[in-house]
Regions:
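N-terminal membrane-sensor/transducer module of prokaryotic signaling receptors
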Residues: 6, 132-134, 152, 159
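Alpha-helical transmembrane segments of compact multi-pass small-molecule transporters, enriched
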Residues: 89, 145-146
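Helix-terminus/linker motif at the lipid-water interface of multi-pass membrane proteins
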Residues: 1-23, 47, 85-95, 156
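Short alpha-helical transmembrane segments in multi-pass integral membrane proteins
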Residues: 45-110, 153-194
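Small-residue-rich hydrophobic transmembrane alpha-helices
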Residues: 19-77, 81-83, 115-134
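Short runs within selected transmembrane alpha-helices of multi-pass transporters and secretion channels
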Residues: 34-38, 108-127, 133-142, 149, ...
Length: 194
């Protein structure tokens, strides 16, 4: 989509594609930190759930949720405040590249501060033996929201639509995660687990 719709803008397909690739490399650093957090809490949740220590499971989830929010906020601020500096690490002599890097980071990462919470929630469901909910959350962002939204929004709004699809997908995935976790903890309350 960057190549196709980038060619229709003043930036051209080369700048759009290379800038998007650069952004994805930086994005992977933040993503890896959140995957590490999610994977680290999974055995704690699993063992405590198996031992019927439901309060510990909820506390672990709460801490993971808070830390994922803090990590996400940290990277969100970097993406919003320093996109030009990040871009200069890769290409320093192109004003068009710098300009598109700002647009790319600030649009694509617009709601990155909520990015980590669905990952932690998916890991939580996997740990407590609810793989269908974990799978639903894992597939939500990419398969159910991001790909269809990218195709629909880019056909309507071009390059900007392709970039705006990610924050919309992240927001929808966050909403799904919150609905599932609130329902889960309410179920625990009615069963007397917590």
């Amino acid at each position: 989509l960057m190549r196709i719709y980038g060619a229709t803008t003043i930036y051209g397909s080369d700048i759009a594609l290379s800038c998007y690739g650069m952004m994805m490399k930086i994005y992977q650093i933040a993503h890896s930190m959140l995957v590490g957090l999610s994977s680290g809490t999974q055995p704690i949740n699993g063992f405590n759930y198996g031992a019927k220590q439901y309060d510990r499971v909820k506390t672990t989830y709460r801490y993971a949720f808070i830390f994922s929010f803090l990590i996400s906020i940290f990277w969100f601020l970097i993406y919003m405040i320093f996109p030009s500096y990040i871009a200069k690490l890769f290409v320093s002599n192109s004003p068009m590249y710098q300009e598109f890097a700002k647009l790319c980071f600030r649009t694509y990462m617009m709601v990155f501060f909520i990015y980590g919470m669905p990952m932690v929630t998916s890991s939580f469901f996997q740990a407590i033996g609810k793989p269908s909910k974990a799978l639903l959350l894992s597939l939500s962002r990419q398969a159910f929201f991001l790909i269809p939204l990218s195709l629909i929004l880019s056909s309507q709004f071009g390059l900007k639509g392709a970039l705006i699809a990610a924050p919309v997908a992240d927001t929808l995935t966050f909403i799904v995660a919150m609905i599932l976790i609130i329902y889960e903890f309410r179920t625990w309350k009615t069963k007397g687990f917590i």
